[in-house]
Amino acid sequence: MSQSPAAHVPVLYTQVLDGLQVTENGTYLDGTFGRGGHARGVLEHLGPGGRLLVMDKDPEAIAVAEHSFGGDARVSIHRGSFAGLGQVVAAATVDGILLDLGVSSPQLDVAGRGFSFGKDGPLDMRMDPDSGQSAAEWLAQASDREIADVLWTYGEERQSRRIARAIVARRAEQPLLRTAQLADLIASVMPRGDSKTHPATRSFQAIRIHINRELADLEAGLDAALGALKPGGRLAVISFHSLEDRIVKQFMARYAKAPPSNRRLPEAQPFVATLQLVSGAIKADDAELHVNPRARSAVLRVAEKLGLGNGESGMGKGNSAAASRFPTADSPFPASANGDAA
């Protein structure tokens, strides 16, 4: 393995566990296992009757999961995207779900995965290298308009058209097969500026999101997670850029708050909340950033599924006990969600 599980530093570790409020006999799902940092924390709080389901579409992550937890009867391992978690668990059976979005540190750190503009490697970018087109294959056949649309939509890259034209012109001379080729090409056509950010940052992000269908998977995964949670179950989502966080924030708000039109106009069926917001946006503190600078852009949001139609939390005594056991005095999460978090 490129990086040992022990060396992996999960972001917002304490905040995630506080947000999930793990109970000894609960059932939990980690939809983005990665190197298992958060999963280990969940397992530490599970008793013999608890259950943890882990998912990842990266075969290297699945290999780590099997090596680390293959002998633990409480753990079930599934290779695939969290967008399909509804095929892994039945409806209303899970006490907590974690989605840690985006590319993992091991994927970025290994040049051979093709995610990093700072390390030369094959231009791949697939989280599942056995599925779909690689970045090189897509860039070899996409039109300049298609490329520009992706760079703008998923990277908010202002120079998207200029970069797209440069890619199409260069591939007519030689194929773009390496990350360094693409990064250098993008840098060569970008206006000079004082930004400390590498000029290829937004383009690499955009291409990666497109290749892996990340935002479509996120929308499907959030819907599936809501269906899989029990009343009182909690959904914790870590995002790393504004596009992801916007989707998560809007999803949680859609099921937690009546839209403005419902407050002004009579409705045949009044709005009934399905989720309760447990927290606003939670970010890493200075101490964590000192140890793990990659946590700087991480944003955690947590919501709790409500009981059917009563507008109240479905948390039972087991979850209340967990609240007194696991959260610390300075935890950003209340023991139960009886009002919208600030």
UniProtKB/Swiss-Prot annotation:
Q: Which domain of life is it from?
A: Bacteria
EC class name: transferase
Q: Which InterPro entries match?
A: RsmH, SAM-dep_MeTrfase_MraW_recog, SAM-dependent_MTases_sf
**GO CC term, one of those recorded:** cytoplasm
Q: Which GO terms describe its biological process?
A: rRNA base methylation
According to UniProt, the reaction catalysed is:
cytidine(1402) in 16S rRNA + S-adenosyl-L-methionine = N(4)-methylcytidine(1402) in 16S rRNA + S-adenosyl-L-homocysteine + H(+)
| Positions contributing to S-adenosyl-L-methionine binding | 36-38, 56, 82, 100, 107
Please list where the region (Disordered) is annotated. Answer: 311-342
Enzyme Commission (EC) number: 2.1.1.199
GO molecular function, one example? rRNA (cytosine-N4-)-methyltransferase activity
Gene3D superfamilies from the xrefs? Putative methyltransferase TM0872, insert domain, Vaccinia Virus protein VP39
The entry's keywords:
Cytoplasm, Methyltransferase, rRNA processing, S-adenosyl-L-methionine, Transferase
Keyword Phosphoprotein, does the record have it?
no
The cellular location(s) given in this protein's UniProt record come to:
Cytoplasm
- What does the function comment of this entry state? Specifically methylates the N4 position of cytidine in position 1402 (C1402) of 16S rRNA.
Q: Which PANTHER family does the UniProt record give? A: 12S RRNA N4-METHYLCYTIDINE METHYLTRANSFERASE, S-ADENOSYL-METHYLTRANSFERASE MRAW
Family, according to the entry, reads as follows:
Belongs to the methyltransferase superfamily. RsmH family.
Q: What is this protein called?
A: Ribosomal RNA small subunit methyltransferase H
* Species whose genome carries this gene: Xanthomonas axonopodis pv. citri (strain 306)
